Amino acid sequence: MPSVRLASTAGRVVDLAEIAERPAVLFLYPRTGEPGKAAGPEWDAIPGARGCTPQSCGFRDLHREFVALGVTVFGVSTQKTGYQSEFVERNHVPFELLSDRDLALTRSLRLPTFEYPVERGGPTTLIRRMAWYVEDGRIEKIWYPVFPPDRNAQMVLEWLGARGRVLPEVRSA
């Protein structure tokens, strides 16, 4: 895992090389929606774009199971930390979201992206949805593409169980 430092919704800077030393899940997503604002038909036309909030809330809803397994959860997008913080508060997300606003991680690992038009200025680069399990400084497993997004957390827990981690009883999503 590269030593890339990303701003966190907890008000700190997180070095991905350091967090990858311990078991962690990073789920990467394009962007979460804005309250009271529809995404529009152009968003729906992008394969795999829709589902960021359900993916995030899936990890939120199963967060206790990850904690019980000793696995830390992080979400990553290219959105600004301020917007991510609003999302965390509004949706009661118990883990940190990390901002790759400057695309340091995206460029370092040549992550799959797409361009999306924004209201002001030119297009913005968004990360395609995926999830990683990291441990001992490296990415052990990648889920890409992720479908359906709301089941991503459950998929990760099932994989961890198949690897021999003691899987707590998991609620149905």
Residue spans for each PLM region:
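Chalcogenol-based redox active-site neighborhoods
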Residues: M1-A173
